[in-house]
């Protein structure tokens, strides 16, 4: 989104005279901008931590929902201050009519997520069951039922970012999104 388009959409929203949080304002600006795009098949929308009340809960039946690594970095935002509370906020309110991709988690976190999602009829695809990502030298080896891919980057130094890349590759492959897109 260009700065000009951002400012234009911000003015449109401000005319509504509706009190919005910064996150709600940014979400609405994104949605207005995305609605004007041509030849776009998918929109990636990142939800906030407190998904139960998140402004990105706009779609009843999204194509998919993606859960990246959940850890205790969000403790200050939830009550009670537990991993269970974080997981409940992140996965407890997901659509019941979608496919949910769950990235690599610590065993305790994965157990909590599975328990929360037990009542959700959506299809679930878990790291370790449907795909994996292994470090080999300076690259990563992605593997799923379609085969292996060698992923290389001299700009990614974080294992967490690599896990997100692997998760994105899984979704892209499942949706038959080509490498050039």
Show where each model-derived region lies:
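Acidic, Mg2+-coordinating active-site environments of NTP-dependent enzymes
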Residues: 34-46, 62-181
